[in-house]
Amino acid sequence: MQAVAAKASTWTAGKNQRFHGMTLGEVKTLMGALPEPAEMKAGPRSNYPEELSLIPKNFDARKHWPQCPQIGHIRDQSTCGSCWAFGAVESMGDRLCIETNGTVQVELSTEDLLSCCLIQCGMGCNGGFPTGAWRFFKVCLEQSPPPPASRRV
């Protein structure tokens, strides 16, 4: 921990009580993002090195989008290796809020993703594929009819 703390410039390393008493193996079961199979990998990435100079030294999404108070909330995955699902639903909810300037504020269901996106997403609490979760959202959005006006958020 001291070696990590020596390199930290904007944060302080410390022990997290959440993992107190757990073995390394138990902690590793919580890291559920699996390496993606070749057929699932996203297409080629764009590289814009000239834009790297435009990246600010500090950026706090909570301050940049105050109309989206869910940004920065941390959910507890308990003993389930579902970080891949939590990350996907949290970022999708944040993106919906940002895109609509705060008019759509939803907490998407991690449980729904874990229960409904089976083969494409992985193995639930035993790990999964973040790309599969994003593809699942895309399919849902493309195939679902819009909700009636009375149910729209």
Located regions from the model:
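Catalytic-core signature of thiol
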Residues: 1-153
